[in-house]
């Protein structure tokens, strides 16, 4: 009798004990439904995460990006940078998108981000369209990763197979944003240390710095190089002379801190390897660019020369390094949430 009573219970247990990776993507879980064989969605990101739960996700992202970048080519670099600044602070969790609230001190107000990071309205537009198509399925963290890849492609750069499945944080770290994002005047050792803390190596540092092949920087980030690089009221002697005088016309000794200069003066809206060629010619804009060549630590200088000579090599490593960066401490499984709106927690 006891056994016969137990049988229905066992049947129900078997019927409902299926792999949660095929669960419905709604209810804020954002689950995909095509987990790799032998893998687990708790610990792994994988490119097919939205194959069944939101197959049109990338198409939606690219449609918004095409319009935004056509309207303002600089936006591509802004979105690439937004992903970088997110991942270096408590992982790739979209914490950078959160606004101030009763419980959140926004990373947007940190020194490296304030009046600097941008592209939030593009992310919001992508999120709104994804919410219409696939409610509470695609995370803001994944939107940042998809937007970074799409921006690179639309600027003429490489594509890569992008692991997905990140979830969104319920917290932000203002202090982390102030201490974990490399400064534009960083030494080569500072850069290497900060990247190593995130599990990234020299190849990652140099290739990801190559993202500066697009975009601009404000005068305040490079003024020191022009007027007082070593505390002696003298310019950085590594600057090529004509480039130096051109920068002085953009960035006077006093005022003009928000004036901008392209990071790659030759092809500022095209993703190519010209950035590395310019470094060899003394035309890198930021100290953190120039020290990749002149820092005399490890093999960064050799990598600069290699990427300057071989654009394909740079593209291949950049793609690998973007995946590496995108894998920094993602929230997966039941950690975090899928935000309905990227700038507030649910």
UniProtKB/Swiss-Prot annotation:
<keyword id="KW-0106">Calcium</keyword>
<feature type="binding site">
    <location>
        <position position="93"/>
    </location>
    <ligand>
        <name>Ca(2+) 1</name>
    </ligand>
</feature>
<dbReference type="InterPro" id="IPR019794">
    <property type="entry name" value="Peroxidases_AS"/>
</dbReference>
<dbReference type="InterPro" id="IPR000823">
    <property type="entry name" value="Peroxidase_pln"/>
</dbReference>
<feature type="signal peptide">
    <location>
        <begin position="1"/>
        <end position="23"/>
    </location>
</feature>
<feature type="binding site">
    <location>
        <position position="272"/>
    </location>
    <ligand>
        <name>Ca(2+) 2</name>
    </ligand>
</feature>
<feature type="disulfide bond">
    <location>
        <begin position="54"/>
        <end position="134"/>
    </location>
</feature>
<dbReference type="GO" id="GO:0006979">
    <property type="term" value="P:response to oxidative stress"/>
</dbReference>
<comment type="similarity">
    <text>Belongs to the peroxidase family. Classical plant (class III) peroxidase subfamily.</text>
</comment>
<keyword id="KW-0964">Secreted</keyword>
<comment type="function">
    <text>Removal of H(2)O(2), oxidation of toxic reductants, biosynthesis and degradation of lignin, suberization, auxin catabolism, response to environmental stresses such as wounding, pathogen attack and oxidative stress. These functions might be dependent on each isozyme/isoform in each plant tissue.</text>
</comment>
<feature type="binding site">
    <location>
        <position position="267"/>
    </location>
    <ligand>
        <name>Ca(2+) 2</name>
    </ligand>
</feature>
<keyword id="KW-0376">Hydrogen peroxide</keyword>
<dbReference type="InterPro" id="IPR019793">
    <property type="entry name" value="Peroxidases_heam-ligand_BS"/>
</dbReference>
<dbReference type="InterPro" id="IPR010255">
    <property type="entry name" value="Haem_peroxidase_sf"/>
</dbReference>
<dbReference type="GO" id="GO:0005576">
    <property type="term" value="C:extracellular region"/>
</dbReference>
<feature type="disulfide bond">
    <location>
        <begin position="87"/>
        <end position="92"/>
    </location>
</feature>
<feature type="binding site">
    <location>
        <position position="91"/>
    </location>
    <ligand>
        <name>Ca(2+) 1</name>
    </ligand>
</feature>
<dbReference type="GO" id="GO:0020037">
    <property type="term" value="F:heme binding"/>
</dbReference>
<keyword id="KW-0560">Oxidoreductase</keyword>
<dbReference type="GO" id="GO:0042744">
    <property type="term" value="P:hydrogen peroxide catabolic process"/>
</dbReference>
<feature type="binding site">
    <location>
        <position position="95"/>
    </location>
    <ligand>
        <name>Ca(2+) 1</name>
    </ligand>
</feature>
<feature type="binding site">
    <location>
        <position position="182"/>
    </location>
    <ligand>
        <name>substrate</name>
    </ligand>
</feature>
<feature type="binding site">
    <location>
        <position position="213"/>
    </location>
    <ligand>
        <name>Ca(2+) 2</name>
    </ligand>
</feature>
<keyword id="KW-0349">Heme</keyword>
<keyword id="KW-1015">Disulfide bond</keyword>
<keyword id="KW-0575">Peroxidase</keyword>
<keyword id="KW-0325">Glycoprotein</keyword>
<dbReference type="GO" id="GO:0004601">
    <property type="term" value="F:peroxidase activity"/>
</dbReference>
<feature type="binding site">
    <location>
        <position position="264"/>
    </location>
    <ligand>
        <name>Ca(2+) 2</name>
    </ligand>
</feature>
<protein>
    <recommendedName>
        <fullName>Peroxidase 9</fullName>
        <ecNumber>1.11.1.7</ecNumber>
    </recommendedName>
</protein>
<feature type="binding site">
    <location>
        <position position="86"/>
    </location>
    <ligand>
        <name>Ca(2+) 1</name>
    </ligand>
</feature>
<feature type="binding site" description="axial binding residue">
    <location>
        <position position="212"/>
    </location>
    <ligand>
        <name>heme b</name>
    </ligand>
</feature>
<dbReference type="GO" id="GO:0048658">
    <property type="term" value="P:anther wall tapetum development"/>
</dbReference>
<dbReference type="GO" id="GO:0140825">
    <property type="term" value="F:lactoperoxidase activity"/>
</dbReference>
<feature type="disulfide bond">
    <location>
        <begin position="140"/>
        <end position="342"/>
    </location>
</feature>
<feature type="glycosylation site" description="N-linked (GlcNAc...) asparagine">
    <location>
        <position position="185"/>
    </location>
</feature>
<keyword id="KW-0732">Signal</keyword>
<dbReference type="Pfam" id="PF00141">
    <property type="entry name" value="peroxidase"/>
</dbReference>
<keyword id="KW-0479">Metal-binding</keyword>
<feature type="active site" description="Proton acceptor">
    <location>
        <position position="85"/>
    </location>
</feature>
<keyword id="KW-0408">Iron</keyword>
């Amino acid at each position: 009798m006891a056994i016969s009573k137990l049988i229905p219970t066992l049947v129900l247990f078997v019927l409902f004990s299926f792999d949660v990776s095929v669960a419905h993507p709604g209810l804020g879980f954002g689950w995909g439904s095509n987990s790799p064989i032998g893998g687990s969605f708790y610990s792994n990101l994988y490119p097919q995460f939205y194959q069944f739960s939101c197959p049109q996700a990338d198409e939606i992202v690219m449609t918004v990006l095409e319009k935004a970048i056509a309207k303002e080519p600089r936006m591509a670099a802004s979105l690439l940078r937004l992903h970088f600044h997110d991942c270096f602070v408590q992982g790739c969790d979209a914490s950078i998108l959160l606004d101030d609230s009763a419980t959140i001190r926004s990373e947007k107000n940190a020194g490296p981000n304030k009046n600097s990071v941008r592209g939030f309205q593009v992310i919001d537009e992508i999120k709104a369209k994804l919410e219409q198509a696939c409610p509470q399925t695609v995370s803001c963290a994944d939107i940042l990763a998809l937007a970074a890849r799409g921006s690179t492609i639309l600027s003429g750069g490489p594509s890569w197979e992008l692991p997905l499945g990140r979830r969104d944080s319920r917290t932000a770290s203002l202090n982390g944003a102030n201490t974990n994002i490399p400064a534009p005047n960083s030494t080569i050792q500072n850069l290497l240390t900060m990247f190593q803390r995130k599990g990234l190596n020299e190849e990652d540092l140099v290739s990801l710095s190559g993202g500066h092949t697009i975009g601009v920087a404000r005068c305040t980030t490079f003024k020191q190089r022009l007027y007082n690089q070593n505390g002696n009221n003298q310019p950085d002697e590594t600057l090529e002379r004509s480039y130096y005088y051109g920068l002085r016309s953009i960035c006077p000794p006093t005022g003009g801190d928000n004036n901008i200069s392209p990071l790659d003066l030759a092809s500022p809206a095209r993703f190519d390897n010209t950035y590395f060629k310019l470094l060899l010619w003394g035309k890198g804009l930021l100290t953190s660019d120039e020290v990749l060549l002149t820092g005399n630590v490890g093999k960064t200088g050799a990598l600069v020369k290699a990427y300057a000579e071989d654009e394909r090599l740079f593209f291949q490593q950049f793609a690998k390094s973007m995946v590496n960066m995108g894998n920094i401490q993602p929230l997966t499984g039941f950690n975090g949430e899928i935000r309905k709106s990227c700038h507030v927690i649910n």
